[in-house]
Structure formats: C-alpha cells, structure tokens
A protein has these predicted regions:
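FAD-binding core of flavoproteins
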Residues: 1-92, 98, 217-241
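Short, well-ordered loop/turn and helix-capping segments at boundaries between secondary-structure elements
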Residues: 21, 25-26, 46-51, 130, ...
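Alpha-helix capping/hinge segments and adjacent helical runs
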Residues: 147-241
C-alpha cells in the first residue's frame, strides 16, 4: 500500500492518493457488512465532521494550564498542520478593512462599495449557516440552508480574493516576510478556488437547490444505480458482477 501526497498550488498537501498493489485483506478485517462500504464511508465522514467540532473545543481551551490541556493542544496542532491554510481559502474577510486603511484604499469610493458589499455577503452567508445548524440541532429534516450557505461561502471567497487584489495591487502576489501580511494575501489568492470544490462543488450545490427547492427535474444520469451493477471489463471480457 503506497500513499502519495498531492501537492496543491498553494504549496500545501492536505490530501493524498493511495495505491494498493496486490494487497490482500483478511476476512477478519472486514468492517461492517460485505457490500456495505457506502454506509461505512458515510459513517466515517459523519464522525470526521464531528471531529472538527471537537477541534474547535480544543482551540477554545488553548492556553489553559495542566498536562491534559497541553497534550490536547499538541495533538491538535499535529493533526491540524496540513490544514493551516483553511482560513485563507475562505477569503479572510477579517483582514480586508485593516488592509484598506493601511494602504489608503478606503478613500476610494468604488473600493469602499466593494468592501461593504463583501461584508454584507459574508454576514448573510454566516446567518444562513447558523440557520442550518439550528435546524439540525432541533432535529428538523435537512433543508436548502446548507447548500445555500455553501454556495454563498464560495461567492464570498471569490469576491474577497478580488478585493484583496484591488487593495494590495501587484504586491498581493508577493510571498515572504516583507510581503502583505507576510504572504497571507498571496496564499488567499491561490487557496480560495478550493472553497468552490471542497464539500461539494458549486455545481452540485446548484443542482441540489434546483431539485429540492425549486422542484426542477433531475438531470439524466447513466450511472443511476448500485455500484455493484456497473458493467466492468475483466481480462478483455465484459462481465456483470
């Protein structure tokens, strides 16, 4: 079993590809039921999402005294290292106003308008996400809020990248200690495209909104069936497994 890191254009490697060559797994190592891989995968993802909540709890406890808290902080830092760029992929709206005041861009009426529009969009996306969390906590069925919030976050990130570029000019592309925010602005520019892909692409979110909210018909699909029924080619002979 070979694991290879996938280099990203922002210089990080948060994901990998796994190659299994002549790998054999014992029946004793079967997780769940045979043919129930999808259920196992969804359960794993659900627990992974909950782990981010626990990670936030650790962050809230940061700085507390005691060996237990110190061990938790160290464990969290190691686990979180590949994802240190995640705040940048959201656009870092929190840096916009400060940079505009430092560079004098705040005096430009057009840029002030873009900054105001960005903050309005960011707050709207935040409140939409809060509604989705509140509905889930109340045990209500999943509504359109999740997809709407995800799509809004993508729009916010793209606009934030454009506003950062307008404020910093050519310096937005610089990295290193003498660059704007020590290279954070440049990392924002090459990280924001990820928000439109991770957690379901913008196109997937639009499909969900179209089908579940607007009641539009689903797109035709040739793969609409169990994976076990997908036709395969084995040793030159087409079989159905």
């Amino acid at each position: 079993v070979e694991v290879r890191q996938l280099a990203q254009m922002n210089g990080h490697a948060s994901f990998n590809e796994v190659f299994m060559t002549d790998a054999v797994v014992s029946r004793d190592d079967l997780v769940g039921e045979a043919g129930g891989g999808w259920k196992c995968a969804m359960t794993t993802l659900a627990n992974e999402r909950r782990s981010f909540d626990r990670a936030r709890d650790v962050g809230a406890r940061k700085g507390r005294q005691g060996k237990i808290f110190a061990d938790l902080e160290e464990e969290f830092a190691i686990a979180n290292e590949p994802y240190t760029w995640y705040p940048q992929r959201a656009g870092r709206v929190d840096l916009i106003l400060q940079r505009a005041m430092e560079t004098g861009a705040i005096k430009d009426p057009a840029q002030r308008q873009d900054i105001a529009r960005l903050h309005i969009m960011a707050e709207s996306a935040k409140w939409t996400g809060e509604r989705a969390k509140a509905a889930a906590k109340a045990g209500k069925p999943q509504g359109p809020e999740g997809s709407l919030g995800k799509l809004a976050a993508s729009n916010v990130a793209r606009l934030a990248a454009r506003v950062h570029t307008a404020i910093c000019g050519n310096d937005a592309l610089l990295t290193g200690p003498n660059s704007p925010k020590e290279g954070i602005i440049a990392e924002i520019l090459v990280s924001t495209p990820a928000i439109s892909i991770a957690g379901g692409t913008d196109e997937i979110q639009k499909n969900i909104i179209a089908e579940r909210v607007m009641g539009l018909p689903k797109e035709p699909r040739v793969d609409d069936g169990p994976f076990r029924d997908v036709r395969r080619n084995t040793s030159g002979t087409t079989t159905k497994s």
